[in-house]
Amino acid sequence: KRTIWLDVLDLPLVGKLDAVFGDMGPVVNYPENISTLENENFRSGGLLPETDKCDVRHSPRLRYPWKEVLQAIENAPPLNDGSSQLNYVNPIDGGPIIPTLSSQVLALRGEQQTRSRRTTARTICVVMEGEGFSQIGNEKIDWEVNDVFTLPHWTWANHTAQSKRAIMITISDREIMKKLNLLRVEVGS
């Protein structure tokens, strides 16, 4: 089965802030921290392991299996426009999995259009299932499985599935904009 690997990093921002640091090897044994625990330790909703391992500034859960994501989005309550959306969260504090980036999964029902919205956050959309189109400003973009496209900041956008269902993962700089008190969101009718 084909695998797609997509790294979304906050490195451009961190680089502009001159705050990029890394520990170069060789390291025979990496120090254990909470993210070295097995992912199964973080699967039970509302329950966390007590551990003497040190914390990390990101989600200690390094893998969110797609089968679990699909089950969760199927059970998610629909929004007013019929779509469903879930946030990927850090199981320790309920915050984002990366402190500066927001990650969601969005499920669209066939032939239904999401409400138009615009935000000061910049967003990357990765189509995981289905096909459809997005109206982004004055431009219509058709998409299908494995397509990647962006939503520029402060541009009206909506999505429509043309298949029975479509699922996207979205990643944005919403978290850093929120922390800088610069996040603004408008939702159309």
Where are these regions (language model features)?
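A short beta-loop-beta micro-motif enriched in histidine and acidic residues
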Residues: D93-S102, R109-I124
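Conserved metal-binding segment of the jelly-roll/cupin
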Residues: K1, W5-D10, I136, D142-S163, ...
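Short, flexible loop/turn elements at secondary-structure junctions
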Residues: L9-P12, A107-Q112, M128, T155
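Active-site lining segments that contact anionic ligands and/or coordinate catalytic metals
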Residues: S83, T100-S103, A121-I124, E129-E131, ...
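Glycine-rich loops and low-complexity Gly/Arg-rich segments
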Residues: N29-I34, E111-Q113, M128-F133, L151-P152, ...
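A short beta-strand-loop-beta hairpin characteristic of the jelly-roll/cupin
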Residues: K1, R117-V145, L182
